[in-house]
Structure formats: structure tokens, C-alpha cells
Amino acid sequence: MASSVLSECGFRPLPRFYPKHTTSFASNPKPTFKFNPPLKPPSSLLNSRYGFYSKTRNWALNVATPLTTLQSPSEEDTERFDPGAPPPFNLADIRAAIPKHCWVKNPWMSMSYVVRDVAIVFGLAAVAAYFNNWLLWPLYWFAQGTMFWALFVLGHDCGHGSFSNDPRLNSVAGHLLHSSILVPYHGWRISHRTHHQNHGHVENDESWHPLPESIYKNLEKTTQMFRFTLPFPMLAYPFYLWNRSPGKQGSHYHPDSDLFLPKEKKDVLTSTACWTAMAALLVCLNFVMGPIQMLKLYGIPYWIFVMWLDFVTYLHHHGHEDKLPWYRGKEWSYLRGGLTTLDRDYGWINNIHHDIGTHVIHHLFPQIPHYHLVEATEAAKPVLGKYYREPKNSGPLPLHLLGSLIKSMKQDHFVSDTGDVVYYEADPKLNGQRT
């Protein structure tokens, strides 16, 4: 079953498997309920629904009736909803609700986004270098760092195969996009595949996964502090590429890393060579243009890009006002793990970074092209029901998410070493260090 689910999503299974949990729902004596919720829920009242896409997009949908539609919950039912309970629908139900054209990949459209973003990157650099004005440099740094992040998202689509159906085109475009911003394409692609295949699993997830309590408490106090004290976590990505997360070993650059299978060594070496070539080019440009000019044109925008990447990816898996579950063992399944992800609204940035905020459907079906994710999300909402958490509307810039980030950094430190359904816990001593 696990192999069929992963192949349906465009994945090649990894050597290690976790059996998918078989669930069923007992009928509730009250006809208004679909299932029996637990007596002691781990979360409080869910956030009221916000119009995430309604103010920015007006989709005219022609959507087939989903196989499973949840009834509008009463107040009592909403209060008792357990996000860790197995859902009353399966992956096929969600897939059936998504229009068929959402699965179609258009390489010309994908390339048009590449041309657009690359043109903007060079245009911004040319304007900044021409005026060379300290009043304009901060605006350039933010804009160019955001565009570097947009390039990363397009390379990310290449890694998933949602860019096109041609693996060679995906590889060439992915290497050009990611190498230009010092990301090893295949090394990251493979580890990101592991992240999607194991999303929501305490031990086997790859990105921003929780630390078990025993590992957390064995960290040095300075490591704990830097891991959860802003802005340091938002600068972590380059260090993660070199040495991964606490509790895991290996490097995205080394072909013998635990991240990779033996047959993937050639791919990793190719990407590391491309990364090295880009680093050498930057060194040469330092001699030609001067280190200060290169710092202004490339160095600072690079770190803005890193902050965007860490900010977005962290909040797609953390920071909801209600605690969301993480799984182990038989309680984990591909569907349940994917339902712990979160959509976010980024205001004006939505279009710039290719609607990466539509993260739930992307995690469940990563081969859907980014330009179909908004429509696919709207179509899937009736099936997902309360397992979909409407994001709060953003202003022009997603400043509202800063509060969610700060709160999560203060509360989400580790999970229990035992239990197959666990929730983040806070370290009161760490919080005490900040007060």
C-alpha cells in the first residue's frame, strides 16, 4: 500500500518503510458526527476561517463533486476536533476532487517563469550598480533576496518533476537555478524527497523535524539557545546543507553521506561540481568588481534569500495557534503526516514566490505544477474539512507571520521520547534564559 501511495505521488520509495496505519471509524450515536472524537482533545478551538484566496484571486472552478464531504461542524464538534485523529477520507478522495487539468505540466509556462525571474534579477542588479545609492541599497537587498528565493522555488519544482515531464530539462534548469544561489541541486533534491516521503514523522522527517527530548537535553546550552533564539534559526540553511540537523549526520555535498543511495553518488558529485564552479565564479568577480561591491550585489541578497527560505519552510510545519501532532510507528502514514502541514498567505509575495504558500496540497501531491496549486487547493478543501486550516489573510507583506514565528520559537522545543502521537513541549528553563 505504501508503495502504491508513493508511486501515485511521483515518489520512488526509500529502503526503509513504515506500515500505513489502517483505520476505521465507529459510528457515533449522534447523526451529526462523522466519527467519535476523543474525550480530552489536545487543542483548543480552531481558528475561524479566513478568506485566504478570495481577496486576491477569483477562480472560476469547474470541480467534480468530491467523494467525501464533511458536514459543517457545530460549535461543540469543532471544540472536540482532534487533529491527531485519523481522517475519514483517503488520498484517493482528495485526488478525485482535484480537476484533471491541474496535473498537466506545461514546460513552456515553467520556462516563462524562469525567464521572468532571471530578467528581474539581472535588472535589479543593473539598476542598483548604476545608481550605487545608499538610500536604494536596502531596497535592492530585500528585492533581490526575495528574487533569489523565487529562483530557489523554481529549482525546487525541477526537483519534484513538476517543472516538466522531461527529466533532462528538469536537471539542467534545476542545476542552473540552484547553483546560481549556492544550493547543490541533486544533494538538496534527494534530501527534500526524503522530507516529503516522511513528512510529519518524528525521526524520519528531514526538514525542521522536532527533536526528541533526550536529544534536545543532550545539546549544549549554547546550541539550544541559538536554535531557538531569533534571528539565528533563520540563518541556518547553509549550515544544514553542510552538516544537517542535530541527531542526523552527513552532508548534502558528500556522495557517501547517509542521505544518499550508492547509485546516487554520480548525481551528488555533479551537483557539488556545479556548486564549486559557482563559488569559483564569485571569487573571480570579487577580484574584478571588488569585495564590497560583490557583498552589496550578491552577498547580502544571498542572506536575505536564506532568511526567506528558513522563514517560509519553518512556518509551513510550525506556528499554528493549536498544537499539531507529530507521528511515529504505526500511527504515521503518508496522508496523516501531510495533513500536519500548513498553508500560509504572503500577500504580494504569493505570486513572486510562485504560490509556495499552498503547502498542504503541494506536500500531498508534489507533482502538481505551482501554477495549478491555488485551484487544486480550493477544489480539495471540501474533502479536507477541518483537517485544512485556513491561513490568516496577509497585508502586502506577511508581517502577521512574525508573531507566529516568535511564539513558536518560545513554545516548540522538543517532543516526548515515547508515544506514537506526540506534540511539541516547551523547555521552561530556556524560556527563563530569555526573560
UniProtKB/Swiss-Prot annotation:
Q: What's the protein here called? A: Temperature-sensitive sn-2 acyl-lipid omega-3 desaturase (ferredoxin), chloroplastic
Histidine box-3 (motif): residue ranges:
359-363
Look up the transit peptide and give its residue range: 1-42
Motif range (Histidine box-2): 192-196
Q: What is the membrane topology noted in the UniProt record heading this document? A: Multi-pass membrane protein
Q: In which pathway does it act?
A: Lipid metabolism; polyunsaturated fatty acid biosynthesis
Q: Which residues cross the membrane?
A: 111-131, 134-154, 268-290, 297-319
Q: Where is this motif: Histidine box-1?
A: 156-160
Q: Which InterPro entries match?
A: FA_desaturase_dom (IPR005804), FAS_N (IPR021863), Fatty_acid_desaturase (IPR012171)
Job of this protein: Chloroplast omega-3 fatty acid desaturase introduces the third double bond in the biosynthesis of 16:3 and 18:3 fatty acids, important constituents of plant membranes. It is thought to use ferredoxin as an electron donor and to act on fatty acids esterified to galactolipids, sulfolipids and phosphatidylglycerol.
- Which reactions are catalysed by this chain? a (7Z,10Z)-hexadecadienoyl-containing glycerolipid + 2 reduced [2Fe-2S]-[ferredoxin] + O2 + 2 H(+) = a (7Z,10Z,13Z)-hexadecatrienoyl-containing glycerolipid + 2 oxidized [2Fe-2S]-[ferredoxin] + 2 H2O; a (9Z,12Z)-octadecadienoyl-containing glycerolipid + 2 reduced [2Fe-2S]-[ferredoxin] + O2 + 2 H(+) = (9Z,12Z,15Z)-octadecatrienoyl-containing glycerolipid + 2 oxidized [2Fe-2S]-[ferredoxin] + 2 H2O
Record Pfam families: DUF3474 (PF11960), FA_desaturase (PF00487)
Q: Which family does the UniProt entry place this protein in?
A: Belongs to the fatty acid desaturase type 1 family.
Q: What is known of its domains?
A: The histidine box domains may contain the active site and/or be involved in metal ion binding.
Keyword Aminoacyl-tRNA synthetase part of the UniProt annotation? no
Q: What species is this protein from?
A: Arabidopsis thaliana
Please name the CDD domains in this protein's record.
Delta12-FADS-like
| Keywords, comma-separated and alphabetical | Chloroplast, Fatty acid biosynthesis, Fatty acid metabolism, Lipid biosynthesis, Lipid metabolism, Membrane, Oxidoreductase, Plastid, Transit peptide, Transmembrane, Transmembrane helix
User: Which biological process terms from the Gene Ontology are attached to this UniProt entry?
Assistant: fatty acid biosynthetic process; unsaturated fatty acid biosynthetic process
